[in-house]
Amino acid sequence: MDMLHNKCSDAIKSTSNSNLSNEVDKQKLQYDDLGNTGFSELFEMESQDNNDSIEDFLFFNINLTQEVEFENQRQYEHTKKTKKHNPFYVPSEVVREMVKKHALNGRI
């Protein structure tokens, strides 16, 4: 059993080592093919990508802000409707104050 296990583990090690060395060789070839000009061009492209990322982030931020404002407005409208139709409605601020007062008095 140990002999079979050793043969399997040796085969796995040699396969993983050959795959690793092939990957390293590929990376070296890609780096050698680029040369100095290719490397500087990649760097310039990255800086442009960063600017695009910043713009995307700003647009996302603006959209998110608008969505939050819209959601707040929707909740406000919903609250107004709820107050109108439900005589037992208590706003959350009032509930918070009541809980705070009870906590200070030691009832909770």
From Swiss-Prot:
GO terms for biological process: cellular response to nitrogen starvation; positive regulation of transcription by RNA polymerase II. It comes from the Eukaryota. One of its GO terms (cellular component) is chromatin. Residues 1-10 have a biased composition (Basic and acidic residues). Residues 12-22 have a biased composition (Polar residues). Residues 1-27 are annotated as: Disordered. GO terms for molecular function: promoter-specific chromatin binding; protein-containing complex binding; transcription coactivator activity. This is Putative uncharacterized protein YLR053C. It comes from Saccharomyces cerevisiae (strain ATCC 204508 / S288c) (Baker's yeast).
